[in-house]
Amino acid sequence: MISRVISATPYGFNGQIIEVEGDMSKGLPSLQIVGMGNKAIDESRDRVRSAIKNSSLDFPKGKIIINLAPAELPKDGSHFDLPIALSILCINGVLNQNDVSNAVFAGELALDGSLRPIRSAIITAEVAKNQKIKSVYVPAQNAEQAALVTGIDIFPVENLKSLFLHLKKEKIIKPIDRSSIKNVSHDHKNAPIIDDIYGQEQAKRAIQIAVAGRHNILLSGPPGSGKTMLAKSLKNLLPALSEDEIVEVTKLHSLGEHTIISNPIVDRPFRSPHHTASRASIIGGGSKVQPGEISLAHRGVLFLDELLEYPRTVLESLRQPLEDHEITVSRANGKFSFPANFLLVATMNPCPCGLLGDPEKTCVCSQNQILNYQKRLSGPLLDRIDLTVSVSRVPHEKLLNNKMSTKSQQDTFLSEIHKAYSIQRDRYKCSYKYNNDIPSSDVDKITSISESAKTFLTNAARKLDLSTRSYFKVIKVSRTIADLEGSASIEIPHVAESLQYRQINIG
């Protein structure tokens, strides 16, 4: 008798149905697993054997072959333990084939038969839904994550014995009640807010514009000027994730984190990889293809502190995802695409010593050193950054004499940003979400710009020798500024402010 149990495995950003087939023949007792599995799957032989025996169930005595089909697809992970165990129980006649049909199973077995959490439970659930399979069995710790996929029943399984009794209809496991799930937000409580920052009004304004329209921003200035604090304050200005975004972000993090993510990700990601991180860890890839930091920052923020300290190859690799909002990784066994729609927030020093343009201290760098340092940021990458802001140190006397306003600037910013979001939502319906999402081909059709503002922009673009990409970025940023001010059309002051942030003066 051949048994068949359905499972799933991640494949790129999506998943693939896997049939766990089992067969037993006469011969010396053995368990062989075939179908391009890795070492973790090979080791499952001993885990499964112990789990079945310690669950007071009989392990068959015979030559057992388990096939993970399709065989041509590489497979890894310990989540095949549970379907392998069920396939063996079907071979032994302890379970019937009908007991395990029309369901997807995934879970790692401990030696005592209990289930441990797995990676990518949400992808298992999504694959089941796409295949019109209504029941999914995953470890209890993963049930809330899998329950993000609606329209199917998610059964939280504590151990192999309880699942066996459920399948035999002796002791029923109830599917998870989605109404009882409470998503806990961490709210970036340790991050600074705008009110914590003294001075830097232009930089604060640029941060507000960046958040309101999802525009990439670069802050340049000497050490101690507050660049990093400004960048981190952006965390507390971001809107909450929508339900669809929670699913996307949780899928990516379930694939890419080194620790197993059991619960849904409900906060917007804020990723800040160190400048020594490898290209594969930031862009994605590796021998086992995984999403990199740019994909883990999807729907959130990628913060690159000291931008020019990153290798040139890493910086140049950002160009395509900044434009296309996804990254494609090519390997011998296929091409894998991951979403990478992030807000880039970067900081940099204007020169190697960091003091170029500082009003109090003198820069000790030669002109050649400054030029070579700034050349690390290529023109094409800089062209993809919407806002560049020079951040100077706040004089000490202003710090001591600073009087905090009784009105919260943070609350004002949040109110204006939410109004801008509402305007964009009404304008674009479901086509786009933010002003920065508009493709250049649609800018003229969608954005309303007055004739005087259009003439002003055309003259400025000619004088500043703006590229085509920069020209359209100025319009998009102008549209965001107009939205923040509640203006139906883009006017000259909006364009003038936007052009200030296109003055590429990183020193």
What are these regions (language model features)?
Residues R299, D305-L307, S317:
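Walker B catalytic acidic pair
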Residues L111, L302-F303, E309-Y310:
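Residues immediately C-terminal
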Residues K171-I209, G213, L241-I294:
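P-loop NTPase nucleotide-binding/switch module
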Residues L219-H258, D324:
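Walker A/P-loop
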Residues M1-L218, P222-T228, S330, S470-Y471, ...:
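Peripheral, non-AAA+ core regions of ATP-driven protein-machinery
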Residues V34, A40-R45, D58-P60, N67-G77, ...:
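Basic, amphipathic alpha-helical bundle interface domains used for macromolecular binding and assembly
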Residues F59-G62, D99-V100, K132, T150, ...:
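Short loop/turn elements that form and flank the Walker-type P-loop nucleotide-binding site
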